[in-house]
Amino acid sequence: MSAMPTLVLHPGRVTLAELRAIAAGGQRLALDASALAGMRASQATVDRIALEEQVVYGINTGFGKLASTKIAHDRLAELQRNLVLSHSVGTGDPLPDGVVRMVLATKAVSLARGHSGVRPALVDALLALANADVLPVIPAKGSVGASGDLAPLAHLACVLIGEGAAQVGGRIVTGREAMAAVGLEPFVLGPKEGLALLNGTQVSTALALAGLFAAENVFAAGLVSGCLTLEAIKGSVKPFDARIHEARGQAGQIAVAAAVRALLEGSAIDPSHPDCGRVQDPYSIRCVPQVMGACLDNLSHAARVLQIEANAASDNPLVFTDTGEVISGGNFHAEPVAFAADIIALALSEIGAISERRLALLLDTGLSGLPAFLIRDSGVNSGFMIAQVTAAALAAENQCLAHPSSVTSLPTSANQEDHVSMATYAARRLLDMARNTAVIVGIEAMAAAQGMEFDRSLKSSPLIEAQFAAIRGRVAFLEQDRYLAPDIEAMRLWASTSAWPAPLAACLPSFQ
């Protein structure tokens, strides 16, 4: 068996492509050695303050509303342990494996920035867990996104102190067993170490990144399904003329129009009907660059925010070794992540909404010119009639889920923490939304492939024909009504892949 490739993490410079790879697993993570000096210096600063018994929040005080309570030096280890245990109050299903891998990696990166005052050994332990795929069991619910992701990160920290639970090879084991599996003894946490592990936006950021990556996949699938529909109804490519989009100047719109032109290059279908009498296609066809371009702009902006956050020191307080100061602030507040997740949600909803409208167009014989509901013997057969109902149901569900979460706030900790971001929920819903959108887009692509089969006298472009063949490799032509649920699931998986032609990959932030 060959050794896993090593991915070296450079704190402050981890890329989206690296984060996507971390989520997928299959590589060994290592920390850039240059980070060691900064971590040691910040740890020394914290140790000095603890010995001098200066009163500094997070080192020798209580937390939240109890921040004014001074803790004796001989109880600092107890303070940190109690912090971790008392905050392990999450509920709900465990986070997906890929999300937990990103949580481990981004927490290690954050601590390695040298502003948290923890031992390098703690960072090494986080990476050891990730490398062995020993994944802390982190309940998905229980964080309001300020002060950081306290409850879910406490469940991660529990494993480091031999408490809580982890997943090893599909089995659930105790935290102590998990540490033994990577050859480590549970930690006795030093001053500030428990707080540094709990404070931070790593869970909401990892969830938002998972949502971003899933959204990129269905965005690409949505462009392919749109091209398939265009070809099936013999629509016009004139609305994708570069001059139209350059006249407006929106970057995403220009990129999407270029991607569609590249996908359709070499098609024999469009040149075959220059004088068909159709003046303008419906908006769901004609305005693909405008709608999907706006979605791409949202995804690109969210990607920039999340890459910054994945590299951020989001602990509190922060240690500044050049002056020896430990300063309280609010980098744990996940408002940037909440906003990013909200605009990913808007994009996911719209990708599904316009796809569902194209699906409805395909099934309407008066608009598409194709057999009603894409079945030859309609009446006896219902064809894709109720598959469109499923798509409509999921599009409506996504429209409800897309309501901004960041506008919701409830005070906590006796009103000390009086404004929160709700970033964790904002990000957590994205995977559900992406799954819904993948089903919608998958149904459209399956229906469009069906529509193309009613006239195969001419071929589409090489890239679209390749996608047509990929679809036919998953689902057969619908000659008469059959059990469609397995076909819909097969097409959901098609729409969820990350293997897309170069013109699409060139649009997507995490593919760069």
From Swiss-Prot:
BP term (GO), one: L-histidine catabolic process to glutamate and formate
Principal location: cytoplasm
Enzyme Commission number, as recorded: 4.3.1.3
Positions bearing the 5-imidazolinone (Ala-Gly) cross-link: A146-G148
Pathway linked to the protein: Amino-acid degradation; L-histidine degradation into L-glutamate; N-formimidoyl-L-glutamate from L-histidine: step 1/3
The entry's keywords: Cytoplasm, Histidine metabolism, Lyase
UniProt subcellular location: Cytoplasm
Positions carrying 2,3-didehydroalanine (Ser): S147
NCBIfam families associated with the record: hutH, PRK09367.1
Name of the protein this chain belongs to: Histidine ammonia-lyase
Species annotation: Paracidovorax citrulli (strain AAC00-1) (Acidovorax citrulli)
Lineage per the UniProt record: Bacteria, Pseudomonadati, Pseudomonadota, Betaproteobacteria, Burkholderiales
